[in-house]
Design a protein with these regions (language model features):
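A polyanion-binding, active-site-adjacent surface
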Residues: 8-135
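Residue-level detector of intrinsically disordered terminal segments
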Residues: 1-5
């Protein structure tokens, strides 16, 4: 059996989920339903946003159905994002103006935002196995 050694970066920063991750059947079914209902939305595992070597890490539970699931950026497009990005700006963790869309030019400074579960769950409630699978 051939073993592949992981680089130091791979052990510190886990890889992002593939666009068509199929590890959680309930989330795959919900994502498929959303893709049919909203074909113009992101509807995929939402990648982390920001600096991998950040001093501040913000971890949400999961993408919101009409927020990050729609836009493809954590906490973007919903009221929680309005509050979070205003707070990050106030304390100097961002540059640019948050406009609730991923192409607004906003950049994080020494901060990173991610979710415990990368795919949007039904009723915004992931189950324990989904959290563990998405590590």
């Amino acid at each position: 059996m051939m073993m592949t050694e992981m680089t130091e970066e791979q052990t510190i920063y886990p890889p992002e989920a593939p666009t068509n991750c199929d590890l959680c059947p309930r989330l795959v079914a919900y994502r498929s339903k959303n893709r049919l209902e909203h074909p113009g939305w992101f509807n995929a595992p939402v990648p982390s946003f920001g600096d991998k070597a950040a001093k501040l890490l913000v971890i949400g539970l999961a993408p919101g159905v009409t927020g990050a699931n729609k836009t493809g950026r954590p906490f973007t497009g919903d009221w929680a994002g309005d509050l979070l990005y205003a707070t990050l700006s106030k304390f100097g963790y961002s540059e640019g103006e948050y406009q609730a869309r991923p192409d607004d030019g906003l950049e994080l400074k020494d901060a990173m935002i991610t979710n415990a579960v990368r795919c949007v769950p039904p009723k915004n409630k992931p189950v324990g196995t989904e959290v563990n699978t998405c590590r």
